[in-house]
Amino acid sequence: MAKRYDQGYFDRWYRDGGIGGRQRLARKVALAVATAEYMLERPLRTVLDVGCGEGVWRTPLLKLRPRASYLGFDSSEYAIARYGRARNLRFARFGDFAALRPRPPVDLLVCSDVLHYVPTRELDRGLPGIAELCGGIAFLETFTRKDAASGDEDGFLGRDAGFYRRRFEALGFRHIGAHCWLSPRLAHHASELETA
């Protein structure tokens, strides 16, 4: 039976104790915002959230930066039907980003807890578009087979870190720590030890 990202799924993993809670999410958002602003040397203006689910990044993000423009995409018909209009969410699968360019490159591109569920062919189809859409920082929270992460293991693809690193670097991303990657547009701005 195919995995369903319905209300029951989001209740289980994000509301009923699930994985991390609001405080952890707020810290994650603050880290991504601060990193983007540090590297851009200006306030954050635009955010694209790929695989956004119910758009949970939106509230803590707008609490920090009320003027930021947030746009989310997800493949959950439930999440888009329920929250699409109120939270500026649209329907798309990861592979759709091979051609989908909903806006100019953004300051912060978020793809949190998504890539380790995306089949390799679809991942390889969508990643170049993700690189094009990122003008600042990409927060690519991804887990590997060696991580002791807890959470939804249904459909988890236990790849090694090199699998992701090779793909991200081939597209021009440079790792700067804590799931943050400099976009190809900013990669040359980092000092050697920022990317070591």
Where are these predicted regions, by residue range?
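Class I (Rossmann-like) S-adenosyl-L-methionine-dependent methyltransferase catalytic domain
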Residues: 1-104, 118-196
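A conserved beta-strand element that flanks and buttresses the S-adenosyl-L-methionine
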Residues: 110
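Short catalytic micro-motifs in class I SAM-dependent methyltransferases
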Residues: 113-117
